[in-house]
Amino acid sequence: MNKEILAVVEAVSNEKALPREKIFEALESALATATKKKYEQEIDVRVQIDRKSGDFDTFRRWLVVDEVTQPTKEITLEAARYEDESLNLGDYVEDQIESVTFDRITTQTAKQVIVQKVREAERAMVVDQFREHEGEIITGVVKKVNRDNISLDLGNNAEAVILREDMLPRENFRPGDRVRGVLYSVRPEARGAQLFVTRSKPEMLIELFRIEVPEIGEEVIEIKAAARDPGSRAKIAVKTNDKRIDPVGACVGMRGARVQAVSTELGGERIDIVLWDDNPAQFVINAMAPADVASIVVDEDKHTMDIAVEAGNLAQAIGRNGQNVRLASQLSGWELNVMTVDDLQAKHQAEAHAAIDTFTKYLDIDEDFATVLVEEGFSTLEELAYVPMKELLEIEGLDEPTVEALRERAKNALATIAQAQEESLGDNKPADDLLNLEGVDRDLAFKLAARGVCTLEDLAEQGIDDLADIEGLTDEKAGALIMAARNICWFGDEA
């Protein structure tokens, strides 16, 4: 028998290119399983094979626990120490028992367990082999094409999957085609796909530029951000760590060779290379190219920017189906509102008039004083109530007592408005989890509550169309808030 075990280990190890120790472990598990089937009760068995001789011993064992719930597999600490005083909780008490002989049933059981363990070992090796390549471009040959995905043969018994959403639109592959993509996920699953590859995520664009532009690999040029409408258009932001080098020109290449190579790999995707700037407003101006920006107004509190362009440039600035401004927004991380110069001016005039009306109504001041506050950049009661006092004292003609009185009136007004809101809502008040969601201020929370959206769970069940006409809430922001709520409520992400 010992020679048979050693022969099996050697044969399987060579055939599957697996370490001998993995095969020994699989055999031990198989023999333990076969032994358990000889007993009517459920027991715990351990088999130990001598790695040199092939001989094996079998042990029945009991886990040392505080309270026994499975008498055939567990033993109390007191009883265990009766035999061995050195034992502790979590240790095992073992008795050697008769080892199984290899009859037909035992052989079949052992074979099934070995096959399963070998398969698990092969899958573990694939995970170990590719985990260090996560985030890199890999190449495979199309093995099978399904409706929802394609399978890639990567060699060495490794397969990857490209899901339909990770392909470019109108991209079709046939068995035998060579395909490149970024390995974005390595999952140690017991069944199904383990390696997931994408061609549509921004990481694919970044890695292709890393291959085509040596300066990126040398860290002379740095890719700061990327945004894609896969297969159609993309924007990538670059900066240089060496002022002698033009990062945009280096990425474009001689006669556009470098950017063209990337574009060709991505099905002719048009790529805008944008110069990174640490100033968010200037970076957004760069990202809006090829459109020329006439002026830009930044609202840091709401993390939005109003972008004004000449009327003749409006269509170009927005792009087909909003593509240009959407990509610029994704690239910069800011919510961008594009309009004509006249529209921006009219918007700011309307906002100024609204702020003046609010100040005169709630602060008991005249229109001239309210106008001065607006011209100095104050537009809400919250700003007047909570900005540092020194900012208000910088306004000509205001002294400390006046500022104190103004701040006190603003705080009282906010309290009055909040109380009125709560009374008007009745029982429909925003819950703490909604108020604490990033991106939801108190005003928006009460607007949502007025629609019956009072909790994160309520928000998670909404669609963008359900929130479309809430003042100050864009479709993009509504979608982001809904997804954030779903991630927390449905998938257990932290707020």
Swiss-Prot record:
Subunit annotation: Monomer. Binds directly to the core enzyme of the DNA-dependent RNA polymerase (RNAP). Interacts with nascent RNA. Interacts with the termination Rho factor. Interacts with the phage lambda N protein. Interacts with SuhB via the AR2 domain, crystallizes as a 2:1 SuhB:NusA heterotrimer. The rRNA transcription and antitermination complex (rrnTAC) consists of RNAP, NusA, NusB, NusE (rpsJ), NusG, SubB, ribosomal protein S4, DNA and precursor rRNA; S4 is more flexible than other subunits. NusG and the alpha-CTD of RNAP interact with the AR2 domain.
Outcome (variant: G181D): In nusa11; inability to terminate transcription normally at termination sites
Note on domains (UniProt): The N-terminal region interacts with RNAP. The central region is composed of 3 RNA binding domains, S1, KH 1 and KH 2. The C-terminal region contains 2 acidic repeats, AR1 and AR2, which bind to protein N from phage lambda during antitermination. AR2 interacts with SuhB and RNAP alpha subunit C-terminal domain (rpoA); AR2 cannot bind to both simultaneously. SuhB, NusG and the alpha-CTD of RNAP all interact with the AR2 domain and can displace the AR2 domain from the SSK domain (S1, KH1 and KH2) of NusA.
Protein name stated in the entry: Transcription termination/antitermination protein NusA
Family: Belongs to the NusA family.
PROSITE patterns documented for this protein: KH_TYPE_1 (PS50084), S1 (PS50126)
Subcellular location: Cytoplasm
InterPro entries per record: DNA_repair_Rad51/TF_NusA_a-hlx, KH_dom-like_a/b, KH_dom_NusA-like, KH_sf_prok-type, NA-bd_OB-fold, NusA_bac, NusA_N_sf, S1_domain
Keyword Nucleotidyltransferase: no
Keyword flag Isomerase: no
Cellular-component GO terms for this entry: cytosol; transcription elongation factor complex
Disruption outcome: Mutants are sensitive to DNA-damaging agents.
Keywords: Cytoplasm, Host-virus interaction, Repeat, Ribosome biogenesis, RNA-binding, Stress response, Transcription, Transcription antitermination, Transcription regulation, Transcription termination
Gene: nusA
One example of a Gene Ontology biological process annotation: ribosome biogenesis
Residue span of region 2 X 51 AA approximate repeats: 364-489
